[in-house]
Amino acid sequence: MRPVLPRAVRCPLRLAAVLLLVGRGASVLSAQTGSQAGTQTGTQTGTVRTDTIWSPSLGAYKSLVVYLPPSYRAASRARFPLLVYLHGRTGNERHWVDAGRLDRTMDSLVRTGSPEAIIAMPDGDDGWYATWNQLGDANACRADTVRREPAATYCVPWTRYDDYIARDIVWHMDTRYRTIGRRESRGIAGLSMGGFGALTVALQYPDVFAVAASHSGVVSPRYLGPKPFTPPPRYANTTAELQAAARNLWSDLRAVMGKDTIGWKARDPGYMAQRLQARVAAGGPPLPQLMFDVGVDDAYVNQNRDLHATLTRLGVPHRYAEWPGAHAWSYWQAHAAESLQFLLGAVTGR
């Protein structure tokens, strides 16, 4: 669901590269809505299908695109790691396949000896993969003439998009498909809004996901400057400053995070990693392995540099990269293989 406020304008988002290593038993209904089909011609190709599931967290039926690896049908007893890929703002559950060619990229990796995995690509609306600070107005959403998707699935009564991913989607995948079904075999990734979601969901649910990756993510939403990034950073501390930091995303983020710094800080990946460090020291689940990258011409490059500096200062291991490119599918297509390989390496030990 998008907050029913003036519709934000989508922000349009040289050669340099940096690479630094620094079960819930909810009732979920599943039904296949698309026929199985090979993702491309050839011997080692996966299949892509669409499920419709009931989400208790959102109170709505949602669509879910699922990639099954080439050997899924033949190896009837084999179990596979689960990867969850999140779309960006204004996207949908088909974008990673239709625009990102993620299925073809995964098939190519398998043909060169990569481990296989099941991939879930859920419909996240414009929900930022978080529990909103304010309850969405489903009735106003249904009356919104600009809305792009059917009201029954888009205008959800409960805006708990983090629980939807970490609980409902994972529960459906573990019960419907032959996943390995444990934390060590699950990873999550996303682009833009989905990059924010991948990192924050993994840091909020370290008992569910062992690894997370972000492409071009909104990963330091309170960052104000300097631009280009140089320490020390400046962060928004007032409502006016939060609005300035959010720019064209303000109508979304004020509904998701609120109008004061408490909600924004609680959903900041750097701050979440710092809090999780304390839980790890007290015997809690380990920190997820983290990777994130961004194009040097991307509007969010300074946010990514800030998160990299924050995690480095905290001593949180992570992999960070900058590559030529902007906030566009050409960039995400080019680098999807890197997040797949990073996640697969973490969930398979290879």
What is the role of each PLM region?
Residues 24-25, 89:
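Hydrophobic alpha-helical membrane-insertion segments, chiefly the h-region
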